[in-house]
């Protein structure tokens, strides 16, 4: 059993390392958007970009639609879902009839998923500090202090780890369909809602990145249409 666990962790760690291309694209695109944010004053929307939004606050104030934050979450979704997808097959994953193998498989996923979540959160801490330092001038009314930023990062870390671990644990004792439903309910009910529903939409898609990309694009489009139909004339893209 111990050798099996070590082997699974090594395999999942190797899969995690193979995400470097997506990580580079993700980090690079976020930094480019940050530079664009620095070039344009967006007032209160900057606070939404840094602290994130909940589903409820998005629906109530779609004019404060944080484009950079949504792209941030889509990037995280691509990385995390693809990490799971690479090893979710009927031959090697939770469809194994042998329960001990299935248990160790998901233990490895929980461990490596936590490492991935921590790495992304560290990057986002640095990224948010960059935005705050760029807007430290008195010309901008950014009502964010260090306590608010710390609380935001703690929720971000807990939210990322919990949504991943919840899916793994439910799938261990049930199956992926139940895990997907539980994760969706977890987000919609707003327990630590830092992520919209599309964060866990791709768990059902294990047939390739194209299918997941289509699913994500459709759900992001739905959120955009909600914002557009409610307050399209008040949406703030790059300027007040």
Model-assigned labels for residue ranges:
Residues 1-9, 102, 141-146:
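Juxtamembrane loop-helix boundary motifs flanking transmembrane segments in multi-pass membrane proteins
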Residues 1-26:
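Aromatic- and glycine-rich beta-strand/loop motifs that create alpha-glucan
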Residues 2, 6, 35-65, 173, ...:
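Terminal transmembrane helical anchor/hairpin motif
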Residues 17, 96, 100-104, 167-177:
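Membrane-interface helix-boundary motifs at transmembrane edges
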Residues 25, 121-126, 224-230:
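N-terminal hydrophobic signal/anchor transmembrane helix of membrane proteins
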Residues 27, 109, 183-184:
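Residue-level recognition of transmembrane alpha-helices
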Residues 31-83, 107-176, 210, 214-217:
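Secretory targeting signals
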Residues 83-115:
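Helix-loop-helix units of permease transmembrane domains in multi-pass membrane transporters
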């Amino acid at each position: 059993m111990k050798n099996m666990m070590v082997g699974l962790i090594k395999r999942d760690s190797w899969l995690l390392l193979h995400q470097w291309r997506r990580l580079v694209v993700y980090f690079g695109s976020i930094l480019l958007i940050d530079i664009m944010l620095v070039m344009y004053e967006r007032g209160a929307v900057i606070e939404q970009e840094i602290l994130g939004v909940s589903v409820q606050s998005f629906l109530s104030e779609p004019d404060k639609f944080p484009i950079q934050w949504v792209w941030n979450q889509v990037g995280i979704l691509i990385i995390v879902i693809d990490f799971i997808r690479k090893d979710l097959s009927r031959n090697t994953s939770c469809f194994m009839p042998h329960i001990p193998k299935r248990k160790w498989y998901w233990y490895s996923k929980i461990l490596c998923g936590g490492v991935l979540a921590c790495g992304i959160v560290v990057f986002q801490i640095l990224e948010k500090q960059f935005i705050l330092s760029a807007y430290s001038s008195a010309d901008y009314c950014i009502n964010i202090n260090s306590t608010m930023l710390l609380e935001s990062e703690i929720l971000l870390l807990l939210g990322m780890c919990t949504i991943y671990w919840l899916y793994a644990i439910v799938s261990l004792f049930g199956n992926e369909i139940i895990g997907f439903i539980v994760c969706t309910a977890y987000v919609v009910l707003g327990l630590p809602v830092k992520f919209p529903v599309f964060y866990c939409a791709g768990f059902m898609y294990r047939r390739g990145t194209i299918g997941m990309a289509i699913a994500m694009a459709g759900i992001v489009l739905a959120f955009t249409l909600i914002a557009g139909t409610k307050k399209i004339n008040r949406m703030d893209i790059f300027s007040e």
